């Protein structure tokens, strides 16, 4: 008997969810130690954790965005590390943080829906190298985080059956929008739009600049030095924590520790709203443009589902509700929706055909620098069973996975769920006159024979 476990991978946070307990969230930071297993997250992620060790380790960041990259990550001490294996170690540390055992768990991992097939395959291959993640020769099931999040929200709040739903994932590196059909087991009906100008990192940066405006010239921070970089990173982390507190509180305090300046400033929710107002407006306009490109409108959506850490910001829900006039569904823990959905899929224990849940090789068109991707009518969508999606690239930039996909069913099964494809038939060549044979002159043959006799 295996216990179900759901994991989710984000650019800034990793989440683990298991039955009967609150999901565990850690920053996508891995600390390597020579005498013990690696630790995931920041020391202040959990006051009861064992991250606060007396001996400092080697801190690794940025490995989530480097999965599948052949170039190794270089740490501060000069050592090199494979980003794929770092991701596996971070996932294993998340399993331990959730109080589970990877060897005795039925694991489903929610990966970003915009990942390329090669990225997904690289993670799958790396998972097979870890004995804890390989049970009976099978690696954990990888699912798109969009599908996992929809299952989580549907189980908690109930999504109306029939019609199209707009899924908005407010993540740390950007906001991702996918139109999904609720009448076909949450099948995507559009390419995923990646909007990078409204993200958790951008909000943190805006709040950091606001702090510098409040502090003025009292701080003597030199960002060119190693000490200055460390102090700036700590201040940015405090800004992130203050942003998260303002999702439930109307005012919070932020400690500022800089060379020549040690103070505490107050930040209100109204100030944060002013900082993100323009970015949120630009995102809503980009969403309008995406709907128009897909020949739909807000009235065609049955509801709007918001997930991700940014969905907890009250202003986001207010603006979407006023603009769309549609019901807004947000889970109780939107940042953990993908992990919770992966847990539900692992609990079912059924094998789901994800060929219709993700796409590869979408013909895309970017317009006006908005990062919007459209699938023109009549174009062919190529489906990869094991890979997730390759949605963010234009057609001239699409990279196809170099790993062959095994056929697990009749490739000509017309009853299987799939996207309709338009076949380009080649017309047979017209009848051409018979090709004239080259004539060989008798004189040429005689000259050749004489030359051969002379040589002998």
Where in the sequence are the language-model features?
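Phosphate/ATP-binding catalytic cores across multiple sugar-kinase/actin-like superfamilies
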Residues: 87-101, 149-156, 275-301, 316, ...
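Conserved phosphate-binding catalytic cores of ATP/NTP-utilizing and phosphoryl-transfer enzymes
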Residues: 1, 140-168, 293, 339-354
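Glycine-rich phosphate-binding loops at beta-strand->alpha-helix junctions
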Residues: 109-119, 296-320, 338
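Early-domain small/polar-rich strand-loop-helix modules and first-structured segments
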Residues: 1-73, 131, 194, 360
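Membrane-anchoring helices that localize proteins to membranes
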Residues: 435-456
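Conserved phosphate-binding/catalytic loops in two-lobed NTP-binding clefts
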Residues: 132-144, 317-343
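Phosphate-binding glycine-rich/basic clefts of nucleotide- and phosphate-handling proteins
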Residues: 180-269, 340, 354-412, 447, ...
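Gly/Thr-rich phosphate-binding beta-strand-loop-beta motif of the actin/hexokinase/Hsp70
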Residues: 1-24, 33, 154-189, 239, ...
């Amino acid at each position: 008997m295996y216990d179900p476990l759901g994991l989710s991978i984000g650019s800034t946070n990793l989440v683990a969810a298991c039955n009967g307990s609150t999901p565990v969230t850690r920053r996508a930071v891995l600390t390597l130690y020579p005498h013990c297993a690696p630790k995931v997250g920041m020391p202040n992620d959990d006051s009861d954790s064992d991250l606060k060790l007396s001996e400092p380790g080697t801190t690794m960041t940025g490995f989530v965005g480097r999965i599948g990259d052949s170039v190794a990550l270089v740490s501060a001490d000069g050592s090199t590390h494979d980003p794929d294996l770092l991701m596996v170690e971070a996932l294993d540390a998340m399993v331990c943080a959730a109080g589970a055992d990877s060897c005795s768990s039925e694991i489903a991992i929610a990966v970003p829906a915009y990942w390329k097939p090669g990225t997904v395959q690289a993670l799958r291959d790396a998972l097979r190298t870890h004995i804890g993640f390989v049970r009976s020769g099978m690696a954990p099931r990888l699912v798109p985080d969009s599908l996992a999040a929809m299952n989580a929200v549907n189980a908690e709040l109930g999504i109306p059956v029939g019609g199209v739903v707009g899924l908005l994932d407010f993540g740390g590196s950007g906001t991702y929008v996918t139109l999904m059909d609720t009448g076909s087991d949450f099948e995507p009906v559009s390419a995923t739009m990646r909007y990078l100008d409204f993200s958790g990192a951008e909000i943190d940066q805006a709040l950091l600049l606001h702090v510098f405006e409040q502090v003025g010239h009292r701080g003597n921070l030199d960002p060119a030095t190693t000490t200055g970089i460390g102090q700036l990173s700590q201040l940015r982390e405090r800004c992130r924590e203050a942003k998260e507190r303002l999702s439930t509180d109307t005012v919070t305090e932020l400690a500022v520790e800089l060379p020549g300046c040690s103070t505490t400033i107050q930040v209100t929710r109204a100030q944060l709203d002013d900082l993100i107002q323009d970015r949120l407006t630009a995102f809503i306009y980009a969403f309008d443009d995406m709907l128009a490109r897909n020949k739909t409108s807000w009235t065609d959506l049955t509801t709007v589902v918001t997930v991700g850490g940014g969905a907890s910001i009250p202003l986001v829900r207010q603006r979407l509700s006023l603009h769309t006039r549609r019901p807004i569904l947000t889970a109780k823990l939107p940042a953990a929706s993908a992990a919770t959905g992966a847990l539900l899929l692992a609990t079912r224990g059924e094998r789901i055909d994800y060929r219709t849940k993700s796409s590869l090789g979408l013909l895309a068109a970017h317009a006006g620098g908005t990062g919007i991707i459209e699938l023109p009518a009549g174009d062919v969508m190529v489906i990869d069973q094991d890979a997730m999606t390759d949605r963010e690239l234009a057609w001239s930039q699409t990279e196809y996975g170099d790993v062959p996909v095994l056929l697990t069913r009749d490739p000509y099964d017309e009853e299987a769920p799939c996207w309709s494809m338009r076949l380009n038939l080649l017309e047979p060549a017209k009848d051409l006159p018979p090709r004239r044979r080259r004539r060989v002159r008798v004189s040429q043959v005689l000259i050749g024979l004489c030359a051969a006799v002379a040589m002998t």
